[in-house]
């Protein structure tokens, strides 16, 4: 598991294995910086 604390637009600089869905990458490319709402999520189990 990974917790990423970088702006979503910078995830295009990271090589993921397995690759992220193309729909997600397209959405991230279209979002301007600062248009994201931050939230915190807690899980009892991973």
UniProtKB/Swiss-Prot annotation:
Subcellular location: Mitochondrion outer membrane
InterPro entries in UniProt: Amino_oxidase, FAD/NAD-bd_sf, Flavin_MAO
Cellular component annotations (GO), alphabetically ordered: mitochondrial outer membrane
Membrane topology note: Single-pass type IV membrane protein
Keywords attached to this entry: Catecholamine metabolism, FAD, Flavoprotein, Membrane, Mitochondrion, Mitochondrion outer membrane, Neurotransmitter degradation, Oxidoreductase, Transmembrane
Gene Ontology biological process: catecholamine metabolic process
Pfam family, one: Amino_oxidase
Annotated catalysed reactions: a secondary aliphatic amine + O2 + H2O = a primary amine + an aldehyde + H2O2; a primary methyl amine + O2 + H2O = an aldehyde + H2O2 + NH4(+); (R)-adrenaline + O2 + H2O = (R)-3,4-dihydroxymandelaldehyde + methylamine + H2O2; dopamine + O2 + H2O = 3,4-dihydroxyphenylacetaldehyde + H2O2 + NH4(+)
Keyword Transmembrane applies: yes
EC number: 1.4.3.21, 1.4.3.4
A GO molecular function held by the record: flavin adenine dinucleotide binding
Cofactor(s) demanded: FAD
Stated family: Belongs to the flavin monoamine oxidase family.
Complex formation: Monomer, homo- or heterodimer (containing two subunits of similar size). Each subunit contains a covalently bound flavin. Enzymatically active as monomer.
Function: Catalyzes the oxidative deamination of primary and some secondary amine such as neurotransmitters, with concomitant reduction of oxygen to hydrogen peroxide and has important functions in the metabolism of neuroactive and vasoactive amines in the central nervous system and peripheral tissues. Preferentially oxidizes serotonin. Also catalyzes the oxidative deamination of kynuramine to 3-(2-aminophenyl)-3-oxopropanal that can spontaneously condense to 4-hydroxyquinoline.
Protein name: Amine oxidase [flavin-containing] A
Source organism per UniProt: Ovis aries (Sheep)
């Amino acid at each position: 598991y990974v917790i990423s604390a970088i702006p979503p637009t910078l995830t295009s600089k990271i090589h993921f294995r397995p690759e992220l869905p193309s729909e997600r990458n397209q959405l991230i490319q279209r979002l301007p910086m600062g248009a994201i709402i931050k939230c915190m999520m807690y899980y009892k189990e991973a």
